[in-house]
């Protein structure tokens, strides 16, 4: 029997809006610093969060104009080669080894915050970014997981719903990234006018 109810889902979405001071301003600051220093924003995620990572990188590059943004999930031959040759846990870390610097930002999306069972590959990439002096932004849910501890700023969607947790967290991540893009575009356009 399907226990999913769309009205309950929508009610949970409305209830799970994070507090207005939920590190959002810090995320904007980190991304603007990266833009101004001509760094690269690398995004990553597994499962549904992979599509959010790609969507956010595309929005930064196109909508905000001038952002260098790359989704680490998009090069399927490279993702497949790392998975086949070195294991799934190295898929993001391996890609970053040749690229990430102190001017760059790594953005991770994970419903459970980089839980080893589902997405330990995200935390491995974050550990490399930290060693390189890069800033790290996390988007997670539930209690934030390992990502909350590793990130310089982590937006956590508070939920404890077993049935609705994943769709609520994933939906809120997309909503929040759209807000970030709107705010970043406004600041960048104002800077260009001066």
Regions found by a protein language model. Give the residues of each.
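Generic N-terminal amphipathic, Lys/Arg-enriched alpha-helix
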Residues: 1-19
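Alpha-helical scaffold segments in soluble metabolic enzymes
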Residues: 12, 30, 55, 59, ...
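Short, flexible loop segments at the rims of nucleotide/cofactor-binding pockets, characterized by
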Residues: 18-22, 82-86, 114-115, 133
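Glycine-rich, small/polar surface segments that engage phosphate groups of diverse ligands
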Residues: 32-105
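C-terminal binding/interaction regions
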Residues: 103-138, 142-157
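A short, well-structured juxtamembrane/interface segment
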Residues: 18-37
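Short alpha-helices
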Residues: 140-193
């Amino acid at each position: 029997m399907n226990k999913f109810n769309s009205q309950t889902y929508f009610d949970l979405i409305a209830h799970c809006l994070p507090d207005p001071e939920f590190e959002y301003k810090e995320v904007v600051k980190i991304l603007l610093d990266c833009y101004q220093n001509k760094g690269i924003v690398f995004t990553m995620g597994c499962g549904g969060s992979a599509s959010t990572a790609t969507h956010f990188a595309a929005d930064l590059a196109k909508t905000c104009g001038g952002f260098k943004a790359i989704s680490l999930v998009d090069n399927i031959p490279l993702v497949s080669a790392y998975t086949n040759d070195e294991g799934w846990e190295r898929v993001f870390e391996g890609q970053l080894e040749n690229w990430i610097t102190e001017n760059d930002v790594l953005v991770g999306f994970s419903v459970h915050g980089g839980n080893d069972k589902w997405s330990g590959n995200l935390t491995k990439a974050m550990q490399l970014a930290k060693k390189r002096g890069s800033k790290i932004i996390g988007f997670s849910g539930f209690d934030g997981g390992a990502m909350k501890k590793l990130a310089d700023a982590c937006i956590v969607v508070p939920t404890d719903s077993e049935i609705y947790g994943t769709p609520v967290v994933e939906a809120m991540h997309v909503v929040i990234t759209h807000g970030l893009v709107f705010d970043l575009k406004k600041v960048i356009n104002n800077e260009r006018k001066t």
